[in-house]
Each structure stands twice: as C-alpha cells, then as structure tokens.
Amino acid sequence: PTDLITVPTAATLMRGSFSLGMRIQDGGGMILGLRAGITDRFQFGLSYGSPNLIGDDSLRWYPRPEANLKYMLIDESITSPGIAIGLNTQGFGNFNQGDSLNRYDMKAYGFYLSASKNWKTSLGNLALHSGVSYNFTETDDGDEDPNLFFGMDIELNPEFSVLMEYNAALNENNMTTETLAISRGGYLNAALRWTFVE
C-alpha cells in the first residue's frame, strides 16, 4: 500500500493508475483525496474536506486544498528496504485557524522520508515501515520538532490484511525522543483492510 492508515509507506502508484480516497472523521468531518501515478516512481495528489460536513452545524471548509507528493528514491531489494521521499500537507480533525495555532488537531506529516521492507510468510506478505517527517506549515504552536512514525501490515489472505501504525507526534504535546512511549502520547491506529480482487 502507498499508505497504511495515515502513515506513508515507500510504495508509489504505478504510472497511469489512480487512487480515490474518502476519510470520515470524528465530529462529522470528511476528507476526499485523489492521487495519480505520474511515473512508476512519482505520484501526485490533492485532498480537501470539512471538519463538520455531516451534521446540522454551520458548514466549515478547510482553508485550502492540501498536497500529497511522493517519489521513490531506492527500490526495495532482498537485503535493503525501499526508500521514498514525500510531502503530505493534509492534517486531520479541526483546523484551528481563529487562534494562534493555525494547525490541524492532528498535524500533517509535511516533508517525510519513509522506508519499507517486505517478506514472504506462510500467510502472505509481511511488511514493516518506518520514517521521519518534518512539518514546516504548522509551526505557529512553537513545536517544530521532527517526527517519527512506524507501522506494519500482514496479509491474512489475498483479500484481507491487518494494519497497525504509530505516529509518535513528537511535534505535538511537548513530546520528545527521550519521553517517547505509547502510553505518553502519539497516535496508535489499527485496521483491517479488504482489497477487492478479481
């Protein structure tokens, strides 16, 4: 996958292919995104949405469309992971524009470097993913630290996969690498993915 749940992997879309995504959020929010494979190594996408599209509150839109770019630098081999660089400016939740924060509740990844490695198991493919990111657009809160993220996915069969990821959120909540712990903050997500195959 090009992403786990929110965490980017080193994979990119194939040339000429596209991906349409919709994310439902807490509070009736919704984000729509479209990505296209420009080459076998480079993908480009845009996303836009609202933190309260569903419901009876006064409709608010995010201040701008957000970008999603990724370029695979190094192909994965038997001994080394695939490596990609990218830019993702789409955060999640409310966009706090009226105060001094000027940021999403959950910051976007911003610039990132991601690495992915796959192995064949008796069940199917097992992949581990990790990376580092720096958000340069949501820094009015005074927290400009780089961030770390990790994840894994494992196939149960050709259609179903289990996904787990952890966004350390080192650029939020005064988290640092010295205090890094799941019990102290960050975002831990898990999901079951159903891929329709012919």
Question: Model regions: which residues?
Answer:
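Glycine- and Gly-Pro-enriched alpha-helical subdomains that act as flexible
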Residues: 143-144
